[in-house]
Amino acid sequence: MKHLISTLLFAALGAVAVPASAEGLDIEVSGIGDAPIAGLKLYSSRFSYPDQPRLTERSGVYDGNAEFHFDDLAPGDYAVVVWADKNENGEFDRSMFGNPKESYMFSNNVHEDEPDWDAVRFTIGGERTQLKLVVSKP
């Protein structure tokens, strides 16, 4: 009976443990201006970019700056786009011709309408990853 309780306790603790391979990502964004919200889309593979982000987040803007923090990301290649969400709709708005309507920046501080995955990808692995992006007008 004692062995059964020990086994069950050990199994329960193992079920809630965070995987050792989980990594973190911190992103500092500046140049947002007077937009009240910054939006971010995080992509986790070449195949999902740019149409299917792994997640979309929003952050409040203070003095033209915003921060995003992510924990428990699997090691690998990622890309992000951040934008000044002036109309607070949670979307990276584009014109009917596909051009960005809001100030934005991709990872690696790439400022193109639709950059290639290789231009914007960065690798998470080892230590916590830090990105600093400066939003620019379209």
Predicted segments, located by residue:
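Bacterial N-terminal signal peptides
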Residues: 6-15
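Short, acidic Ser/Thr/Gly-rich low-complexity loop/linker segments typical of extracellular
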Residues: 50-63
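A glycine-anchored, Pro-Gly-centered beta-turn/N-cap motif
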Residues: 64, 69, 74-77, 127
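Short, ordered, surface-exposed loop/turn motifs in non-cytosolic proteins
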Residues: 34-50
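A short, amphipathic beta-strand motif
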Residues: 24-32
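Acidic, glycine-anchored loop motifs typical of Ca2+
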Residues: 85-94
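A short tyrosine-centered beta-strand micro-motif
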Residues: 78-82
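N-terminal signal peptide c-region/cleavage motif recognized by signal peptidases
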Residues: 17-19
